[in-house]
From Swiss-Prot:
Cellular compartment(s): Cytoplasm, Cytosol
Keywords: Cytoplasm, Detoxification, Phosphoprotein, Transferase
Coiled coil: none
Modified residues (Phosphothreonine): 158
PANTHER family named among the record's database cross-references: GLUTATHIONE S-TRANSFERASE U15 (PTHR11260:SF628), GLUTATHIONE S-TRANSFERASE, GST, SUPERFAMILY, GST DOMAIN CONTAINING (PTHR11260)
Protein name: Glutathione S-transferase U15
């Protein structure tokens, strides 16, 4: 790409969906300017102008053109900088379809279940919600075994689309485990997924991008009783 190319990312430090864009940019060795947004205060004019429909982060601005929605951004990065780094999406159409399917599963089924359990008021509702979260993780365990084919990641030897989609929530999960003294990723129940999580977070492309677990735990503790908590992620 040309020297005059301008890349800017609007985000919030604690947001898993923003982490997705950051990891993709890192994988593709893309230099960019980062703009921190305060979603609990006044949203910037740039954010409202760049994403007038959803008014949410992340937003990738590439040569003045905004790209919105986290997984859409990841695909855009993969296609735009296709000569840099390994491909994020698989090359075969069927494998790409599977990657998108499981990413939809994470965002449209598993994540809403997790967030409902997090904000549930009664212990009964929390317990039921966490059972459903565990069921989803068992399904993801089976998917990992099938898709990774004995390799380190859902994408095989390298971090791919599903890895970014699910892996972006690992710091949140570990922060809750630490804060609540509860196990979400269980080494005995989902051993392959447990190993994958450790490999993902220790990967050079990830560990300097994701926020500190203790910092996220403190943030959760401060905001989880507020109605706005759900907006954090």
């Amino acid at each position: 790409m040309g020297e005059r190319e301008e890349v800017k990312l609007l985000g919030t430090w604690y947001s898993p969906v923003v982490i997705r864009a950051k990891i993709a940019l890192r994988l593709k060795s893309v230099d960019y300017d980062y703009v921190e947004e305060d979603l609990f205060g006044s949203k910037s004019e740039l954010l409202l102008k760049s994403n007038p429909i959803f008014k949410k982060v992340p937003v990738l601005i590439h040569n003045t053109k905004p790209v919105c929605v986290s997984l859409n951004i990841v695909e855009y990065i993969d296609e735009t900088w296709n000569s840099s780094g390994s491909s994020i999406l698989p090359s075969h159409p069927y494998d790409r379809a599977l990657a998108r399917f499981w990413s939809v599963f994470v965002d449209d089924k598993w994540l809403p279940t997790l967030m409902a359990a997090v904000v549930a008021k009664s212990e009964e509702a929390k317990a039921k919600g966490m059972e459903e979260v565990e069921e989803g993780l068992l399904q993801l365990e089976a998917a990992f075994i099938a898709l990774s084919k004995g390799k380190s990641f859902f994408g095989g030897e390298t971090i791919g689309f599903i890895d970014i989609c699910l892996g972006s929530f690992l710091v949140l999960l570990k922060a809750r485990e630490k804060l609540k003294n509860e196990k979400i990723l269980d080494e005995l129940k989902t051993p392959s997924l447990y190993r994958w999580a450790n490999q993902f977070l220790s990967n050079e492309m990830v560990k300097n991008v994701v926020p500190d677990i203790d910092k996220v735990a403190k943030f959760i503790e401060e905001f989880e009783d507020r109605a706005q908590y759900i907006r954090c992620f």
